[in-house]
Amino acid sequence: MTPFWIALQFLTVLPIELKTIPTAQQNGRAILFYPLVGLIIGGILFLVTCIFVKLPALLLAAIVLALWIWLTGGLHLDGLADTADAWVGGFGDKLRTLQIMKDPSCGPIGVLSLVIICLLKFALVYVLIEQHQSLFLICIPILGRVVPSILFLTTPYVREKGLGRSLTDHLPKTASWIITGFVLLLPLYWGWQGLIAIIGFLISLVYLRHVFIKRIGGITGDTVGAAIEIGETVLMFTFVVSYFYLV
């Protein structure tokens, strides 16, 4: 179960202590448990909506989003901000883009990207709560956590060192594809809405993958984080839009 604890420690702020330093092989296997960690995150979010169901939807949406960000430690938001800064500041140059991504400071474009994504997520969470579709909150982090598998399975990792390199070199490919395929079927519980949400989600990943390859020749940890945030938002958006047009 060590890979599971590695995944839980990496993807959340939950107090997990590992007895030994993870090996590259364990890091690679940990990615198989990312969707399970997503289930834990989503389950907590849904539980909160059930406990505080009597609160105004606006306030509850703010609580859910704040808890969501806290649970993940803002890990993927950090990747989004770094990617946004690098994409604008890199002026189309691969090396400059990669260099800016390594800068720990957050520029104005990075801040703007965080504001936009958080506003969108807040509005979408609010609509889900208001329309009594809070159960879908469980599904969102699960699908978000298969984004790394999809990208690492299909896209070159451009840095020579780091956690991403371990994941790329030691990811169990067959098991990862099976888990990814199963997870992508989960939204079908919601019928046509779920199917449209899956399609929108996958289209966003295909587009982001194309953009990443065109600019830097592949992916980095930051771009994967950005893809998780954007993918989750597109998933929610397409689900909400289809809800109003199909119901």
Swiss-Prot record:
<feature type="transmembrane region" description="Helical">
    <location>
        <begin position="227"/>
        <end position="247"/>
    </location>
</feature>
<dbReference type="GO" id="GO:0051073">
    <property type="term" value="F:adenosylcobinamide-GDP ribazoletransferase activity"/>
</dbReference>
<dbReference type="InterPro" id="IPR003805">
    <property type="entry name" value="CobS"/>
</dbReference>
<dbReference type="GO" id="GO:0009236">
    <property type="term" value="P:cobalamin biosynthetic process"/>
</dbReference>
<keyword id="KW-0997">Cell inner membrane</keyword>
<protein>
    <recommendedName>
        <fullName>Adenosylcobinamide-GDP ribazoletransferase</fullName>
        <ecNumber>2.7.8.26</ecNumber>
    </recommendedName>
</protein>
<dbReference type="GO" id="GO:0008818">
    <property type="term" value="F:cobalamin 5'-phosphate synthase activity"/>
</dbReference>
<comment type="function">
    <text>Joins adenosylcobinamide-GDP and alpha-ribazole to generate adenosylcobalamin (Ado-cobalamin). Also synthesizes adenosylcobalamin 5'-phosphate from adenosylcobinamide-GDP and alpha-ribazole 5'-phosphate.</text>
</comment>
<dbReference type="Pfam" id="PF02654">
    <property type="entry name" value="CobS"/>
</dbReference>
<feature type="transmembrane region" description="Helical">
    <location>
        <begin position="183"/>
        <end position="203"/>
    </location>
</feature>
<keyword id="KW-0808">Transferase</keyword>
<keyword id="KW-1003">Cell membrane</keyword>
<feature type="transmembrane region" description="Helical">
    <location>
        <begin position="109"/>
        <end position="129"/>
    </location>
</feature>
<keyword id="KW-0169">Cobalamin biosynthesis</keyword>
<keyword id="KW-0460">Magnesium</keyword>
<keyword id="KW-1133">Transmembrane helix</keyword>
<feature type="transmembrane region" description="Helical">
    <location>
        <begin position="135"/>
        <end position="155"/>
    </location>
</feature>
<feature type="transmembrane region" description="Helical">
    <location>
        <begin position="55"/>
        <end position="75"/>
    </location>
</feature>
<dbReference type="GO" id="GO:0005886">
    <property type="term" value="C:plasma membrane"/>
</dbReference>
<keyword id="KW-0472">Membrane</keyword>
<comment type="pathway">
    <text>Cofactor biosynthesis; adenosylcobalamin biosynthesis; adenosylcobalamin from cob(II)yrinate a,c-diamide: step 7/7.</text>
</comment>
<comment type="similarity">
    <text>Belongs to the CobS family.</text>
</comment>
<keyword id="KW-0812">Transmembrane</keyword>
<feature type="transmembrane region" description="Helical">
    <location>
        <begin position="31"/>
        <end position="51"/>
    </location>
</feature>
